[in-house]
Curated annotation (Swiss-Prot):
Keyword Zinc annotated: no
Gene it is expressed from: psbY
Subunit structure: PSII is composed of 1 copy each of membrane proteins PsbA, PsbB, PsbC, PsbD, PsbE, PsbF, PsbH, PsbI, PsbJ, PsbK, PsbL, PsbM, PsbT, PsbX, PsbY, Psb30/Ycf12, peripheral proteins PsbO, CyanoQ (PsbQ), PsbU, PsbV and a large number of cofactors. It forms dimeric complexes.
Keywords recorded for this protein, A-Z: Membrane, Photosynthesis, Photosystem II, Thylakoid, Transmembrane, Transmembrane helix
Official protein name in the record: Photosystem II reaction center protein Y
Family that this chain belongs to: Belongs to the PsbY family.
Protein's job: Loosely associated component of the core of photosystem II (PSII), it is not always seen in crystals. PSII is a light-driven water plastoquinone oxidoreductase, using light energy to abstract electrons from H(2)O, generating a proton gradient subsequently used for ATP formation.
GO cellular component: photosystem II; plasma membrane-derived thylakoid membrane
Length: 37
């Protein structure tokens, strides 16, 4: 059980970091396109 946590925690953290970094510029561009109207 502990080994699974040690293995999956960095993977989940990396995926979450990538998703966050992809979402942030996409959200800014979304606001730029649709927020002005």
């Amino acid at each position: 059980m502990l080994r699974a946590i040690v293995v999956f925690a960095p993977i989940i953290a990396a995926v979450a970091w990538v998703v966050f970094n992809i979402q942030k510029p996409a959200r800014e561009q979304w606001d730029r396109q649709f927020g002005e109207k």
